[in-house]
């Protein structure tokens, strides 16, 4: 029991990994963005296998341990309440008007709504490239224990490996993320071929009618966005508000070739489709390509190099960088690794 790789990560890396000779070599791993965070806290795992290990199956369960959004609400609501002269509290109706003195006479005029104030604070925090209190509070909740249940089944024989996995994650605010993956690989001589499919379906808790319930919704949405938009996962956003995407699919194809005893080469292509955005802002596609080479100097020391390319298209909310709004990116990785 403890912080462990989840069953989705296990089945992908053990059955149809992008770079099987060293699945942790390259930091560019779009398929791991479909693995619900890849690691799970407070996890229990139970594995069964046939004596020849042709069949392997694992079940996983983790405890939520009262991880909830109250820390974010306790931090955000007093600050927003002070900024609005005490007009915003945890029980405030989302449509309630926020008034302020306007003009020479100081007449009170509605300048915003409770929902508008919260949305503005979230947007400012999300678009700020630097750490800030609101993002840090949400990230602390996201790093806490969440309730999960899932499993995987794998078959391997004569160079062929097939596997499938599924897992449900209940987020702190009450939303559910259902994640599925299936795929396979085949080895023959120096060649390795792999293909896989991943699906994430997000079932959001309702926005409710009060600021407190709306914060639950927004925190869950941000945690999902963190899983989806990390740079190692491809790095494109699913959105933050009611027009956010709720479904992401990905296919991958690739091959590896062991050119010599020391030199391994690989090329992989991934295509993702994002949908569910109510106004289309976050609906679209993403293509990922990566070429990599690894040279082993010894059993414990190797050098590697990779070049990757990412391009997104579709709704105006799809981009790879908040500041520049870039829709394409090229990355180069070079490294030397020694295992102690």
Go through each PLM region and give its residues.
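Loop-centered beta-sheet repeat module
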Residues: 59-82, 86, 93-99, 128-176
